[in-house]
């Protein structure tokens, strides 16, 4: 995470189990941050409904009348959110991935048979948007980064099929899983995250075991926080 530009990059490995009786030839991911861009489906919805979320609009005067204008509509390039994917592979073989708004559609290199496993790997780059709803940067409480749904998130597949719905500020429907996450960020930032901090005695900031003193070398510029979150 670059705390000056609010941009971040990473890589993801996902071991996917097909618990269904169906053979899967495609998979879908959510790219939620892409909703926070002018012209997105969420932006269009805000502009077209009568009662938009008050957090997502500005009140402006047009011809002497007060109207509600989408905050997303006016975001500048360094204020938007985005999530971009590259180098998508299935078991080491390149698969075809296509981004459509907040959804990534992947045509698999090989089908996933019922009750079998496969491994997906990918690289991603993102930018944290100005806070519009629950996530974003520089919120009113003084939190620098409120990170929710910030990574490429596999969509849910169940008896109804794929739940690859575009994000328009409605509720989430996701997959339960075991997460192992490493986040490298400026050493002056204190993180909170789901699960357990595995390297607390390297991080300090009050997370360390009682009696442990954590002293960082003066040349240290960043820290890598290692979280493990089972079944979330």
Regions found by a protein language model. Give the residues of each.
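Extended, low-hydrophobicity, Ser/Thr/Pro/Gly-biased non-transmembrane segments
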Residues: 53, 60-90, 97, 123-232
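Surface-exposed, glycine/proline- and aromatic-rich loop segments on solvent-exposed faces
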Residues: 23-56
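Short strand-edge motifs at loop-to-beta-strand transitions and within beta-strands
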Residues: 102-106, 118, 223
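Short Pro-Gly-centered flexible turn/kink motifs
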Residues: 10, 113-122
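Extracellular/luminal ectodomains and secreted, surface-exposed scaffolds of diverse proteins
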Residues: 91-105
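Short, hydrophobic/aromatic beta-strand segments
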Residues: 9, 22-29, 40-41, 132-134, ...
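Asparagine-centered strand-capping/turn motif at beta-strand->loop junctions
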Residues: 16-20
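N-terminal, polar/Ser/Thr-rich
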Residues: 1-9
């Amino acid at each position: 995470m670059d705390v000056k530009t609010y941009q971040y990059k990473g890589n993801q490995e996902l071991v996917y189990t097909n618990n269904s009786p169906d053979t899967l030839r495609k998979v879908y991911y959510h790219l939620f941050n892409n909703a926070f861009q002018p012209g997105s489906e969420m932006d269009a919805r805000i502009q077209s409904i009568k009662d938009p979320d008050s957090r997502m609009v500005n009140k402006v005067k047009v011809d002497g009348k007060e109207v509600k204008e989408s905050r997303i509509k006016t975001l500048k390039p360094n204020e938007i959110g985005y999530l971009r994917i590259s180098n998508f592979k299935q078991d080491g073989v390149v698969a075809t991935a296509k981004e459509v708004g907040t959804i990534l559609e992947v045509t698999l290199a090989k089908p996933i048979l019922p009750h079998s496993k496969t491994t997906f790997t990918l690289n991603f780059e993102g930018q944290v948007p100005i806070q519009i709803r629950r996530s974003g940067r520089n919120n009113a409480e003084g939190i620098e980064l409120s990170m929710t749904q910030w990574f490429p998130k596999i969509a849910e597949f169940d008896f109804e099929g794929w739940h690859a719905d575009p994000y328009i500020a409605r509720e989430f429907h996701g997959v339960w899983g075991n997460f192992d996450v490493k986040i490298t960020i400026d050493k002056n930032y204190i993180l909170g995250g789901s699960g357990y901090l595995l390297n607390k005695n390297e991080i300090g900031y009050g997370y360390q075991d009682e009696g442990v003193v954590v002293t960082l070398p003066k040349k240290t510029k960043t820290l890598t926080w290692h979280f493990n979150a089972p079944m979330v």
